[in-house]
């Protein structure tokens, strides 16, 4: 929005630079001068890099501003000058670092007498530090030429900014070779020894504190950088000097030989604690996932331990007689004799020394009875948790290292204080073998001389009495509980168990009984209370079924998964509510695999026709054969193309009045029926009586039971009234007559010619059928021009055994015309193509609310009601009676490309036959007359009084009559 409304202000720096006599102060008054400088405005950089401007910038950060200036703007220009000099612009850095006159002007800041202005000192340190990082060689060369540089820095070490500058020289010099040269230069200047000298009671507290902090940082930086280097370089000379025994002894001498001040004792002890920092070993003797070099770099040098050991008595005296402190007011009252920072650091040093597990130091501490003194302080200063923690660490170190000694003794190996250091120049402390140690000296001392068990019991009982009297619970009870638990754990298990058990058994009887009662009752109850979770860990019920998350705080991936599950659940619910179907529309739930196809849509219609139509007999004669069920077991092969030999039979009435039965010649066409269709083909070829129509009243072959699921898609045509009905879902074999290639003598054939017929009510320009049967049967129509008989141009009518309705969404189409002459009929007729035929369209419905599924196969001949296009024909047996009723099961599919379902040639003088009754599923009847075309559409059929899917009755198309030509 800021840029949208063009609120950005234009910089005035360029305008000022266009002036002839612009000053640096005028430019620094602009707020965007830093942005322009970092953007490397060349005109501005050229102005700033002038000698006069550079000198003015350096003077601003090294000279105190006038005192008469207002305080809030007094250091404005020095701050801006420092930012300009350290903005990491190469042009400015090169100009400042490459000019010794500017460096000398900058260096003169150190010649001021202490104390330095802290703010100006920070500007100076930042500028020099930036030059050390950017122009290392030039700056280091310049500083080496200054003999008093280290002395001046140490002179102003009380200013923290100068301490930072010294650390930059130690850590920020690159590459490693140049850094090593700088370290050697600093070591030659005796930086470590001079810093140690600053830790003296005669020095200011700030100088002592900063000198101590500098030494601690040098130790840590030296160890860290030494461990991070892959190649084995020479050791850090500064770290080696600081870890030397002479340096440690000098430090301790400065601490204790003069007037003992708390600041000196604390500062010196901090350096010793840093030198004693070690890599802690895990409870199972495993180190954490750091490199081996890092472990070695944190090892304690034996020279440090040798330097500290003679001064243990001084630290013991420090714990007894610390520097005097005044009484202080605390939240629990006035503390007359505070513990003091010096004694606290002394306790920290004892814990660090015990952690090294040096036998000589352990023996000296036992001789001095230092642990007993620490326990006295523990129970005296009940509210000093810093002290309580250090005493707990001391006891834990004694017990854990005693166990380590036992493990070493059992393995017969020698226990070392530390692994070898990577430097190789510092020898490591090699303690005596654990086997030669006198019976775990520190453990025995802790339980016998220090009376740890008795002190725990006495303090616990005293606290119970205090609380019973209405007093406060003591502040050290938490640490006392942890100490007691450590004793019990080492008593119950571990290598030190035997030794502690002997010590406990050596206690007086009353004390031993109190301890056992304390462990079994009091301590157990306390631990039970302490282990109660402050926050309930009971997991709330989640809508997700994933119950594998056991942590109270699941990780990020688990949270994301739970949120995703929640979103999916909400989205699914909304989707079903908004875009789903109503349950009442699909009340029947089929277990069949094809059930989803039943729920799409359906077309239900009935056709009323004249009961005297003779077409019912011919329709029944063609449809009486049972249809092969769809085999669901071969779903994986339904899309594979294969060849099959199909035959179609059409019943027509030629011009001379004798009915003929014609069989189609074998043709190659696509079949998608799979293995089952091939087997059926072979069976029909081998069956006797091929090509013979079924005798009237004759019972068909025994039914073949199909798969229960496959039977759901079978098409059943009921037998005539005199035949035995068959249960739905059972398919009967109709013989192989329809599959056998007929070889009858050529006869004269008469073909129906529809050129004079009127088209159906709907044109072919309507929407194309979306049924899969349309696609499947397109191959059948294409095969008309591929056979050996070029004249077979008739449209096919196919009935699929698994199709409930092929015209579920298509509109009424024109009936394709069937034309034949002497050339196409093989010489059967010469000029008899004007014979008109009656065509009945088979339209099948699946029932209310259903739509035909996609058909995977091209219908076989036994499922076909009629198919035209064969050269051979035979006389139809006149004894075949006309059926009274035709019932079509919902499995007949009619390809839109071959819309002619049944072509029946009727004689104009033919007798009237009663019209068959209309079945609930389908009733197709052709009235008396030359022709009546029946077709199906989603909402219209070409018959009088047709019932559409919408449940409405549409009027017949114009020109249509019940008993007359269309």
UniProtKB/Swiss-Prot annotation:
Post-translational modification Phosphoserine, affected residues: 289, 771, 828
Disulfide bonds listed in the record: none
Gene Ontology molecular function: protein phosphatase binding; protein phosphatase regulator activity
Tissue specificity annotation: Ubiquitously expressed with strongest expression in the testis followed by liver, heart, kidney, brain and placenta.
A Pfam family of this chain: SAPS
Entry GO CC: cytoplasmic ribonucleoprotein granule; cytosol; nucleus
Family per similarity comment: Belongs to the SAPS family.
Protein name per the record: Serine/threonine-protein phosphatase 6 regulatory subunit 2
Source organism of the structure: Homo sapiens
Gene: PPP6R2
């Amino acid at each position: 929005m800021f840029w949208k409304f063009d609120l950005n202000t234009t910089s005035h720096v360029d305008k000022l630079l266009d002036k002839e006599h612009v000053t640096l102060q005028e430019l620094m008054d602009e707020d965007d001068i830093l942005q322009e400088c970092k953007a490397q405005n060349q005109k501005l950089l050229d102005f700033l890099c002038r000698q006069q401007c550079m000198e003015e910038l350096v003077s601003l950060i090294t000279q105190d501003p006038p005192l008469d200036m207002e305080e809030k703007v007094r250091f404005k220009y020095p701050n801006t000058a420092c930012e300009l000099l350290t903005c990491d612009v190469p042009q400015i850095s090169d100009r400042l670092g490459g000019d010794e006159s500017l460096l000398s002007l900058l260096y003169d800041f150190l010649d001021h007498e202490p104390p330095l202005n802290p703010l100006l000192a920070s500007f100076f340190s930042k500028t020099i530090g930036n030059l050390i990082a950017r122009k290392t060689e030039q700056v280091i060369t310049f500083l080496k030429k200054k003999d008093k540089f280290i002395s001046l820095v140490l002179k102003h070490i009380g200013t923290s900014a100068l301490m930072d500058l010294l650390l930059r020289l130690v850590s920020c010099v690159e590459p490693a070779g140049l850094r090593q040269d700088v370290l050697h230069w600093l070591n030659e200047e005796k930086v470590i020894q001079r810093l140690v000298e600053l830790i003296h009671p005669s020095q200011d507290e700030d100088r002592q504190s900063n000198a101590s902090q500098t030494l601690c940082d040098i130790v840590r930086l030296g160890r860290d950088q030494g461990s991070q280097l892959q190649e084995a370089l020479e050791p850090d000379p500064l770290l080696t000097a600081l870890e030397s025994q002479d340096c440690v002894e000098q430090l301790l001498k400065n601490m204790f030989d003069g007037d003992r001040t708390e600041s000196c004792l604390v500062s010196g002890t901090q350096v010793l604690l840093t030198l004693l920092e070690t890599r802690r070993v895990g409870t199972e003797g495993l180190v954490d996932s750091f490199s081996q070099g890092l472990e070695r770099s944190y090892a304690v040098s034996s020279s440090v331990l040798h330097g500290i050991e003679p001064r243990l008595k001084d630290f013991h005296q420090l714990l007894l007689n610390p520097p005097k402190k005044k009484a202080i007011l605390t939240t629990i009252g006035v503390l007359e004799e505070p513990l003091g920072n010096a004694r606290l650091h002394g306790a920290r040093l004892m814990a660090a020394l015990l952690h090294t597990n040096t036998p000589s130091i352990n023996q000296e501490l036992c001789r001095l009875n230092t642990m007993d003194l620490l326990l006295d302080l523990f129970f005296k200063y009940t509210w000093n948790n810093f002290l309580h923690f250090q005493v707990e660490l001391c006891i834990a170190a004694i017990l854990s290292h005693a166990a380590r000694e036992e493990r070493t003794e059992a393995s017969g190996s020698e226990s070392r204080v530390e692994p070898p250091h990577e430097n190789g120049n510092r020898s490591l402390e090699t303690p005596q073998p654990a086997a030669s140690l006198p019976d775990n000296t520190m453990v025995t001392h802790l339980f016998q001389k220090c009376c740890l068990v008795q002190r725990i019991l006495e303090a616990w009982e005293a606290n119970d009495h205090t609380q019973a009297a209405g007093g406060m619970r003591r502040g050290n009870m938490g640490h006392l509980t942890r100490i007691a638990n450590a004793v019990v754990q080492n008593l119950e298990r571990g290598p030190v168990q035997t030794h502690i058990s002997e010590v406990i058994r050596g206690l007086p009887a009353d004390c031993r009984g109190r301890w056992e009662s304390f462990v079994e009752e009091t301590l157990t109850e306390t631990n039970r209370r302490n282990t109660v979770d402050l926050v309930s860990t009971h997991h709330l019920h989640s809508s997700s079924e994933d119950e594998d998350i056991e942590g109270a705080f699941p990780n990020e991936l688990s949270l994301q998964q739970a949120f995703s599950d929640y979103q999916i659940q909400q989205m699914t619910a909304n989707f079903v509510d908004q875009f789903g179907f109503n349950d009442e529309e699909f009340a029947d739930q089929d277990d069949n695999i094809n059930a989803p196809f039943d729920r799409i849509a359906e077309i239900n219609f009935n056709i009323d026709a004249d009961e005297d139509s003779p077409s019912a007999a011919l329709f029944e004669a063609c449809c009486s054969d049972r249809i092969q069920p769809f085999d669901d077991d071969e779903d994986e092969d339904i899309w594979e193309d294969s060849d099959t030999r199909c035959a179609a039979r059409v019943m027509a009435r030629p011009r001379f009045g004798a009915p003929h039965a014609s069989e189609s010649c074998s043709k190659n066409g696509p079949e998608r029926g799979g293995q089952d269709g091939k087997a059926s083909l072979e069976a029909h070829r081998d069956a006797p009586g091929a090509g013979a129509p079924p005798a009237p009243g004759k019972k068909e072959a025994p039914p073949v039971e199909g798969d229960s699921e496959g039977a759901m898609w079978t098409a059943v045509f009921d037998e005539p009234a005199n035949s035995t009905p068959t249960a739905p879902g059972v398919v009967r074999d109709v013989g192989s007559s329809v599959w056998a290639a007929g070889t009858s003598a050529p006869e004269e054939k008469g073909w129906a010619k529809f050129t004079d017929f009127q088209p159906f009510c709907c044109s072919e320009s309507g929407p194309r059928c979306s049924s899969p049967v349309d696609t499947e049967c397109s191959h059948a129509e294409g095969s008309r021009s591929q056979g050996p008989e070029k004249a077979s141009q008739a449209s096919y009518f196919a009935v699929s055994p698994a199709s409930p309705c092929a015209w579920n969404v298509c509109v009424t189409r024109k009936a394709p015309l069937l034309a034949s002459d002497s050339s196409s009929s093989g010489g059967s007729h010469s000029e008899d193509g004007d014979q008109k035929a009656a065509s009945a369209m088979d339209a099948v419905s699946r029932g209310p609310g259903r739509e035909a599924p996609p058909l995977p196969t091209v219908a076989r001949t036994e499922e076909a009601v009629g198919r035209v296009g064969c050269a051979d024909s035979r006389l139809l047996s006149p004894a075949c009676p006309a059926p009274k009723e035709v019932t079509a099961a919902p499995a007949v599919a009619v390809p839109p490309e071959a819309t002619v379902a049944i072509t029946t040639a009727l004689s104009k003088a033919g007798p009237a036959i009663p019209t068959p009754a209309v079945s609930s599923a389908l009733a197709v009847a052709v009235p008396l007359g030359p022709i009546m075309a029946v077709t199906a559409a989603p909402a219209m059929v070409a018959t009088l009084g047709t019932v559409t899917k919408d449940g409405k009755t549409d009027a017949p198309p114009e020109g249509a009559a019940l008993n007359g030509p269309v």
